[in-house]
UniProtKB/Swiss-Prot annotation:
Keyword Disulfide bond attributed: no
Protein name: Chromophore lyase CpcT/CpeT 3
Keyword Lyase among UniProt keywords: yes
Gene of this entry: cpcT3
Cystine bridges: none
GO terms, molecular function: lyase activity
Organism: Synechococcus sp. (strain JA-3-3Ab) (Cyanobacteria bacterium Yellowstone A-Prime)
Family: Belongs to the CpcT/CpeT biliprotein lyase family.
Protein function: Covalently attaches a chromophore to Cys residue(s) of phycobiliproteins.
Enzyme class: lyase
Amino acid sequence: MSVSPQLAQLATWMAGHFNNLHQAIAEPVWFANIHVYQCPLPWSVFQGIGFYVEQLYDIYPDQPYRQRVIHLFETPDGIRIQNYALGSPEAYKCAGRDLGKLASLAAAELELLPGCAVQVEWTGSCYRGRSVPGKGCIVERKGRTTYLYSEFEIGADYFHSLDQGRDPETDQVVWGSLSGPFRFVKKQDFSCYLPRWS
């Protein structure tokens, strides 16, 4: 196992339970109280660094509204994060609070989501990611075809995230935040569950 210092640092900062309670209290009209769990996966899933990611509303702790798997890897242009769908999401429901559920997860259970990737850069103090160009991450929602635009910023103890569904023709925001990114604070560190690399 060989991982660059930057990829190792990004994975370490990403691993954890994040929450935006402070933001939800300050701006309740615009931001719900949300939990994000970014749980390290066994090295064997990708022969590299992967995470199971789960998002849920605080008032519905047993009903995650988003489950996915991501793979972090390096390209000549820097770090990239590729998204995958779970074939049986119900089997891993609430794994953010029971990481043992993820021990049996295998690559065969995952479906690559074409175009759903984020390119990451190091700014000197944090990592910033943005959807790869091309409007290729298609999401059907409420009878409308949209493309997913994502961006994030992550530091040692915070994670800011913006996801929007946009119209492919006009780029108008169809769903997602219109008031800026969700601002999460790390509540629990999961980096001890990352694979050991040399």
